[in-house]
Structures are given as structure tokens and as C-alpha cells.
Swiss-Prot record:
Its main location: secreted. It comes from Pongo abelii. Glycans are attached at N69, N125, N192, N361, N397, N550, N579. GO terms for cellular component: extracellular matrix; extracellular space; membrane. GO terms for biological process: cell adhesion. Residues 24-124 form the SRCR domain. The gene is LGALS3BP. This is Galectin-3-binding protein.
């Protein structure tokens, strides 16, 4: 009788229970000390490619499995070809790691290998002479339970909010003195300690004190600021540093943008320059989403004054940016503050018809009419007068930011492709605007010769330059996602294995020695936020690792929880090369 389907599912699950990512085993070796190296990751076993495989790497495997060392590091599927995915490639260990997962490599599931390159090892027959029973993992919870009991204490801890007691705990000096993170509680003599805490952080104090015992703590988007604040105030340097690393992970998790704004305000108040810089970068790259978010009306004026001068502001267009400021304005800012913001708008980046319509579409216009007329005149000169005359008679430096584009994501200046490793041949990114309908961006795949693979490819055109003088002069572009060396060859690019995948960009037409380009590539995570922005250098743009791995590639500024980017937007950014001092 055939066992029911549920039974087989049970067998499958049972076979991987108790196995952790990075665990290793030897297969098909005919003896316990040799075989094909297999490593566990995300619920399944896979193999390791023999690229760069050496005795140091093999010894890490052998020691992890209880042997003294490795005697041979074998490749070319010496113990037969495995099945499942190639988990790791180009592994480079130092010899001290607990697992191959801790060694430098291309990262999980990133390999051009086939199973005929599976790595194997032969370990010494001798196992280690010392056998260890290690129950230390239970110690953390046991110490936490001592704190939970609130018994047998010799230290009184009062939690004070604005001069009034809010909570009380007791502690055990003998445990706390063993942890430098808790030194603020025991370095002063006496049996009484008072902690002054902001009201919003009171609910986190118990978890902080328990952390001093168990050395384990759970941190969420809503609690990270308070834990960072408490750790900073009470000298818990490891916790403080760990919270700092979480900000980049947690910032994108609040689509309302209240938390990023709150963290920015916290960074300014505490003088945390690194956190302030991180918040500004996230808000700049995701400025379009911010303007559509619930928190947009509450963005403080001083923050906008820092964001609006930036060239890395990602917005559909300069007109869209000005309209967003108009929506934000209302009655919240003074006349002088609003004028300061309008001064930072790049009017030359708006077309003449857009400039003309401002008087009919903006509530700001008539309350600041003189300023708008002045900025409009400046922009119209840029659009209608050749740059040589502007530089000669007006003394304008056309390389200033006012005359250069930001990161404009509208179809006029950008194109989108997806990652072919998970896309179908015809794909779409669907972005749900918080204030509008679904917007879909489609991406075609290049019809290559029959012996080629299909790779996401987009042909598009842009104006040669933002000036209206160039509106009839079009430049043709081709954007392609290149995941392999072969794909680079197919499309005329030279790539090395350690830089893949990359985006390739080619240009045809519109040659002008006075115009240069600073093109950008936006890494999009789950259609929800911009995780990173890279430059096109030599017509290629690097694609960072979506998550922090042991890969030699840099990690995305804001990690993508999915483990991959769902798409890439390329933005064309032309500008004049010359300035007033060099023009005849």
C-alpha cells in the first residue's frame, strides 16, 4: 500500500529538522572521513564548486566534522556529482572559520559551476582526542530566568521619568559585574541605582536589564531607537553598535515614513552624524515615496532645506518635486522659509510649457510671484540662449547644480529592466502609489540569436540635454542586465567574474563634446523602495549584494529582505561640460 502524501512530506521535513544553515556533511565517500562536500542552506543540501578550492578550505570542513585536519582537497567531482544547487563558489577560507559559510566566497547560490566541478575532501582518520559536552547555550536563558524571578537580589534599580519613579527592579551584582555592558549599574558604590529614562522608552527598560543577564535581546523597528538611546546613555557599547547596524535594515520597513523621520530627529538631537547621514540618504533616494506617504505633511522645514539641494534626490521630474513642495506648504512655514525652499528648486530643469503653467497650478506662485518670475526668467534663458552666450554675457557657470539634473525617474529620462534569474520572459514591475492607481513598468527581453540566452534588455531614447534647444535631438540607449561572462561577451562588454552581475548601457547618436553624462542605476527592492544607487563607469553599473553575505561584492546601502532586487532603473543625466571661464 502506497503511503499517503502527508507521510512523504513528514519524511522530508524530518530529514532536515535540527539542521542549521552552514552545517556540512560528506557524501558518497565510502568512508566517514572522505566524500563530496555538501552544505545546508535554506532547507536544502547543496554542493560547493572547486574554484579556488584548496587544503585550507578542506581543513575547515574536516575540523567542523570532528577530524584533526584535511589531507587532500579534491575537485572535478572526485566522489561523484551531487544534486541540488551549487551553494558556494570561489570559497577562500583563512582556516579559523567554523564553517565554509563563514569564509569569503561569491555568496550563497551565486555560481557558474556545474556538478562536474563539485569539491571533495579527504580528512585524517584521527578524530580529535578531546570530546566536549557543551551546554553553554542554556546558560543565557538560565541567567535571564534569574532576572525574571526578581529574587535573591542585592541591588535596587529605580526607573525615573521626569523626576518621578515609574518602575522598580532588583538586580544581582555578582552577575552584572561579569558584564561590561552593565557597568553603569555597578561601577558606583551602594545598593541603589536610579535610571533616568524618557517616557517612550520605559517599556524597553525591562528587556535592557534582562539583556545584561542573558546577553540576548530582540529588537524591532519600533524599539530600535529606544534601545540605541538606552545603550548610549548607560554605556552598553556592543548593544549601541548593534542597533546602529540595524538602522539601515529597519529604515525601509515603515511605508508611512514616520519612523525614518523620527530616527532623523533623534540623530539630530543626539548629534549622531552617521545616523543622520544614513537617514538623509534613504530619504533622498526614496523621496518620491516620501512625498506620497502619510508623513509628508509633517516633514520639518529644516529637513527639506537639507534635502532639496541634493543632486541624488530621486523624483519623477523637477516639476513633480515643486508640486510636492506646494502640497507640503499649506500654512506651516513662514514666508522666508518657503522662499528658501523655492530657491533650491532647479527651474532650468523644467520645460518652458511647464514653467508657463506654474501660475495656474501652484498655490505658492501668487504668494511668491516675484521670486517665481525671477526663477522662470533664469530658466527660459537656459532653454533659449546658447550656453556660449550665457557664459559670455551673463557670467553663468553652467556646471553648477542649478543647471544639472537630479535623478529623474520619469520615462523621459529613465528605463527599467528586471533580474532575469527570477523573471519570466516578459515581465512587469507593479508599483502601488499611495495616492494613485497601480503603475506598471514593462521590460522587454532582447531577441538574441538562437544560441544566446535571453537577458532583460530595454531600448529607449532621451533628449540630448535638458535645455529646450536640444529637444529635437534624441539619443538612443540600450540597457541590459548581464549576469554572466557569456552575456557580457554577447552584448559587447568586458566583465570579470567578481563584478557580476552588472548593468550594461550603450549609447548611439547625439555626439556633442560639450555634453557629458553622470548616469545612475537604481536598485529596486520588492517594488517598495530604492535600496542603492550606483554610477555607470565605463558604461557598466555595479549591482551590489542585496543582503550582507561573505561575497567580495559590496553590500547594498539598505539591504533587501528578499535577497535579490526585483528590478533596476537606469537614469540618464546629461549636463554641460564647459563653464564661464573656459568659453570663447
Amino acid at each position: 500500500m502506497t503511503p499517503p502524501r502527508l507521510f512523504w512530506v513528514w519524511l522530508l521535513v524530518a530529514g532536515t529538522q535540527g539542521v542549521n544553515d552552514g552545517d556540512m556533511r560528506l557524501a558518497d565517500g565510502g568512508a566517514t572521513n572522505q566524500g563530496r562536500v555538501e552544505i545546508f542552506y535554506r532547507g536544502q543540501w547543496g554542493t560547493v564548486c572547486d574554484n579556488l578550492w584548496d587544503l585550507t578550505d578542506a581543513s575547515v570542513v574536516c575540523r567542523a566534522l570532528g577530524f584533526e585536519n584535511a589531507t587532500q582537497a579534491l575537485g572535478r567531482a572526485a566522489f561523484g556529482q551531487g544534486s541540488g544547487p551549487i551553494m558556494l563558489d570561489e570559497v577562500q577560507c583563512t582556516g579559523t572559520e567554523a564553517s565554509l559559510a563563514d569564509c569569503k566566497s561569491l555568496g550563497w547560490l551565486k555560481s557558474n559551476c556545474r556538478h562536474e566541478r563539485d569539491a571533495g575532501v579527504v580528512c585524517t582518520n584521527e578524530t580529535r582526542s578531546t570530546h566536549t559536552l557543551d551546554l553553554s547555550r542554556e546558560l543565557s536563558e538560565a541567567l535571564g530566568q534569574i532576572f525574571d524571578s526578581q529574587r535573591g537580589c542585592d541591588l535596587s534599580i529605580s526607573v525615573n521619568v521626569q523626576g518621578e519613579d515609574a518602575l522598580g527592579f532588583c538586580g544581582h551584582t555578582v552577575i552584572l559585574t561579569a558584564n561590561l555592558e552593565a557597568q553603569a549599574l555597578w561601577k558606583e558604590p551602594g545598593s541603589n541605582v536610579t535610571m533616568s529614562v524618557d517616557a517612550e522608552c520605559v517599556p524597553m527598560v525591562r528587556d535592557l536589564l534582562r539583556y545584561f543577564y542573558s546577553r540576548r535581546i530582540d529588537i524591532t523597528l519600533s524599539s530600535v531607537k529606544c534601545f540605541h538611546k538606552l545603550a548610549s546613555a548607560y554605556g552598553a557599547r556592543q548593544l549601541q553598535g548593534y542597533c546602529a547596524t540595524l538602522f539601515a535594515i529597519l529604515l525601509p520597513q515603515d511605508p508611512s515614513f514616520h519612523m525614518p523621520l523620527d530616527l532623523y530627529a533623534y540623530a539630530v538631537a543626539t548629534g549622531d552624524a552617521l545616523l543622520e547621514k544614513l537617514c538623509l540618504q534613504f530619504l533622498a533616494w526614496n523621496f518620491e515615496a516620501l512625498t506620497q506617504a502619510e508623513a509628508w505633511p509633517s516633514v520639518p522645514t529644516d529637513l527639506l532645506q537639507l534635502l532639496l539641494p541634493r543632486s541624488d534626490l530621486a523624483v519623477p521630474s523637477e516639476l513633480a518635486l515643486l508640486k510636492a513642495v506646494d502640497t507640503w506648504w499649506g500654512e506651516r512655514a513662514s514666508h522666508e522659509e518657503v522662499e528658501g525652499l523655492v530657491e533650491k528648486i532647479r527651474f532650468p530643469m523644467m520645460l518652458p510649457e511647464e514653467l508657463f503653467e506654474l501660475q495656474f497650478n501652484l498655490s505658492l506662485y501668487w504668494s511668491h510671484e516675484a521670486l517665481f518670475q525671477k526663477k522662470t526668467l533664469q530658466a527660459l534663458e537656459f532653454h533659449t540662449v546658447p550656453f556660449q552666450l550665457l557664459a559670455r554675457y551673463k557670467g553663468l557657470n553652467l556646471t553648477e547644480d542649478t543647471y544639472k539634473p537630479r535623478i529623474y525617474t520619469s520615462p523621459t529620462w529613465s528605463a527599467f529592466v528586471t533580474d532575469s534569474s527570477w523573471s519570466a520572459r516578459k515581465s512587469q514591475l507593479v508599483y502601488q502609489s499611495r495616492r494613485g492607481p497601480l503603475v506598471k513598468y514593462s521590460s522587454d527581453y532582447f531577441q538574441a540569436p538562437s544560441d544566446y540566452r535571453y537577458y532583460p534588455y530595454q531600448s529607449f531614447q532621451t533628449p540630448q540635454h535638458p535645455s529646450f534647444l536640444f529637444q529635437d535631438k534624441r539619443v538612443s540607449w540600450s540597457l541590459v542586465y548581464l549576469p554572466t561572462i557569456q552575456s557580457c561577451w554577447n552584448y559587447g562588454f568586458s566583465c570579470s567574474s567578481d563584478e557580476l552581475p552588472v548593468l550594461g548601457l550603450t549609447k548611439s547618436g547625439g555626439s556633442d563634446r560639450t555634453i557629458a553624462y553622470e548616469n545612475k542605476a537604481l536598485m529596486l527592492c520588492e517594488g517598495l523602495f530604492v535600496a542603492d544607487v550606483t554610477d555607470f563607469e565605463g558604461w557598466k553599473a555595479a549591482i551590489p549584494s542585496a543582503l550582507d553575505t561573505n561575497s567580495s561584492k559590496s553590500t547594498s546601502s539598505f539591504p533587501c529582505p528578499a535577497g535579490h532586487f526585483n528590478g533596476f532603473r537606469t537614469v540618464i543625466r546629461p549636463f554641460y561640460l564647459t563653464n564661464s571661464s573656459g568659453v570663447d
